[in-house]
From Swiss-Prot:
It catalyses: D-glucose 6-phosphate = 1D-myo-inositol 3-phosphate. It holds the Pfam family Inos-1-P_synth. Its EC number is 5.5.1.4. It is an enzyme of class 5 (isomerase). Its main location: cytoplasm. Belongs to the myo-inositol 1-phosphate synthase family. GO terms for biological process: inositol biosynthetic process; phospholipid biosynthetic process. It comes from Sesamum indicum. Pathway: Polyol metabolism; myo-inositol biosynthesis; myo-inositol from D-glucose 6-phosphate: step 1/2. Key enzyme in myo-inositol biosynthesis pathway that catalyzes the conversion of glucose 6-phosphate to 1-myo-inositol 1-phosphate in a NAD-dependent manner. It is found in: Cytoplasm, Cytosol; Nucleus. Keywords: Cytoplasm, Inositol biosynthesis, Isomerase, Lipid biosynthesis, Lipid metabolism, NAD, Nucleus, Phospholipid biosynthesis, Phospholipid metabolism. This is Inositol-3-phosphate synthase. The lineage of its organism: Eukaryota, Viridiplantae, Streptophyta, Embryophyta, Tracheophyta. NAD(+) binds at residues 70-73, 143, 180, 190, 193, 230-233, 281-282, 306, 309, 340-342, 355, 393-394, 422-423.
Length: 510
């Protein structure tokens, strides 16, 4: 059975006019390696820590500024939200299609809330806590191309023509602000687009981005702004002591106009100084150590890296299944080809390397979890190939071959072929990222013994379900297994309304 909404009644939760207060007993374990009777052994000690959560239930008017607004993702998301807001339908060769938010975790997935008369009861994910309605989001942003969003939508060739015609009047007046352009960080083939750029030194560019965000907030009368990078993949920045390894060195490098400070890092700096959440949707190392240091100092939310949309999402499910089943993946070969501007930019070796790193690290934690299958330092052969084929446009092809060792020296090979509209997968993920980033800024918590409430750590691991290479605070383990990431996100939101984690034991029927 599916219900649209619910309210929790419990001694552990209290609803007030503007807040939800909850108490949650976090059950975990502590491990110690100690000598007992002359022999060292591992001791596992269960422990319980009481947490209090406080969630602001006032849903703000939200503005979203996209870096690369005029690209395939930006124009597709903007058009999709308008179509949903206006209730637009359009003819395809198969049927009359209604606008929807399929592919969005927050808008189109469900959570189990319990059982009733022997039947499982589910509710929308978005019913857990008050969230911004995507129909109410105000979009803006920057792009190195001055093409308006209606023409950009046509250039992208993602949405059906009948839908594009209906959206054009809403999008013709939407023109991106000038963006930061540095040809050293992206493929040379992007130069022909760059007719809408911010001039000046890196310090002046940061100041302009700050001004743009303030103007956008004032002109659109929004309460909060979230910024997300959906522009070209950049090459990796060199991390150098004295250049970008600390907040102080990073800001000094901006003052000196150092060439190695990337455009994406400049946007992130501007956002941190304005306390505006910044999310990196591409694989480059935008968050150099100095930027992470700066965000922690100023307690400003950052999240990333790289949208987890198709092939990598499948990989994080399949490898988790194989290793969890005691099967040993020994070779993973992933091949992609696509024909959109993302593929064109990735045809340059230096930008492809960023994507290769992002895609290749996704199985590391799963491999490390099983010392029966893998010796220390052992890892599957893992190859990623991306090719640019203009004809296929936004319809990305992904082919994977997984070779594994099974019982008694046997071999198993799984081959997958996935064809998908790249931007139609990415757009709802962008939506989820900005909505969850905004929501997380309204949640505060404190552990037993802490004097006052505080926000989540500014490095937003809560967003990891949606990213290929989750950004985590220094010293924090990286989790890539998809089911664990979703459970983490759902269970944190459940704790905010006093609900226990979904552990799937269902003891009442055992």
């Amino acid at each position: 059975m599916f219900i649209e909404s619910f309210k929790v009644e419990s001694p552990n939760v209290k609803y007030t006019e503007g807040e939800i207060h909850s108490v949650y007993n976090y059950e975990t374990t502590e491990l110690v390696h100690e000598s007992r009777n002359g022999t060292y052994q591992w001791i596992v000690k269960p422990k319980t820590v009481k947490y209090e959560f406080k969630t602001d239930t006032h849903v703000p008017k939200l503005g979203v500024m996209l870096v690369g607004w005029g690209g395939n993702n930006g124009s597709t998301l903007t058009g999709g939200v308008i179509a949903n807001r206006e209730g637009i339908s359009w003819a395809t060769k198969d049927k009359v299609q209604q606008a929807n938010y399929f592919g969005s975790l927050t808008q189109a997935s469900s959570i189990r809330v319990g059982s009733f008369n022997g039947e499982e009861i589910y509710a929308p994910f978005k019913s857990l806590l008050p969230m911004v309605n995507p129909d109410d989001v105000v979009f803006g942003g920057w792009d190195i191309s001055n093409m308006n969003l209606a023409d950009a939508m046509g250039r992208a060739k993602v949405l059906d023509i009948d839908l594009q015609k209906q959206l054009r009047p809403y999008m013709e007046h939407m023109v991106p602000l000038p963006g930061i352009y540095d040809p050293d960080f992206i493929a040379a083939n992007q130069g022909s687009r760059a007719n809408n750029v911010i001039k000046g030194t890196k310090k002046e560019q940061v100041q302009q981005i700050i001004k743009d965000m303030r103007d956008f907030k004032e002109q659109n009368k929004v309460d909060k702004v979230v910024v997300l990078w959906t522009a070209n993949t950049e090459r990796y920045s060199n991390v150098v002591v004295g250049l970008n390894d600390t907040a102080e060195s990073l800001m000094a490098s901006v003052e000196r106009n150092e060439a190695e400070i990337s455009p994406s890092t400049l946007y992130a700096i501007a956002c941190v100084f304005e306390n505006v959440p910044f999310i990196n949707g591409s694989p480059q190392n935008t968050f150099v150590p100095g930027l992470i240091d700066l965000a922690i100092q100023r307690n400003s939310l950052i999240g990333g890296d790289d949208f987890k949309s198709g092939q990598t999402k499948m990989k994080s499910v399949l490898v988790d299944f194989l290793v969890g089943a005691g099967i040993k993946p020994t070779s993973i070969v992933s091949y992609n080809h696509l024909g959109n501007n993302d593929g064109m930019n990735l045809s340059a070796p230096q930008t492809f390397r960023s994507k290769e790193i992002s895609k290749s690290n996704v199985v590391d934690d799963m491999v490390a979890s099983n010392g029966i299958l893998y010796e220390p330092g052992e890892h599957p052969d893992h190859i990623v190939v991306i090719k640019y084929v203009p004809y296929v446009g936004d319809s990305k092809r992904a082919m994977d071959e997984y070779t594994s060792e099974i019982f008694m020296g046997g071999k198993s090979t799984i081959v997958l072929h996935n064809t998908c509209e790249d931007s139609l997968l990415a757009a709802p993920i962008i939506l989820d990222l900005v909505l969850l980033a905004e929501l997380s800024t309204r949640i505060q918590l404190k552990a037993e013994g802490e004097g006052k409430f505080h926000s989540f750590h500014p490095v937003a691991t809560i967003l990891s379900y949606l990213t290929k290479a989750p950004l985590v605070p220094p010293g924090t383990p990286v989790v890539n297994a998809l089911s664990k990431q979703r459970a983490m996100l759902e269970n944190i939101l459940r704790a905010c309304v006093g609900l226990a984690p979904e552990n799937n034991m269902i003891l009442e029927y055992k």
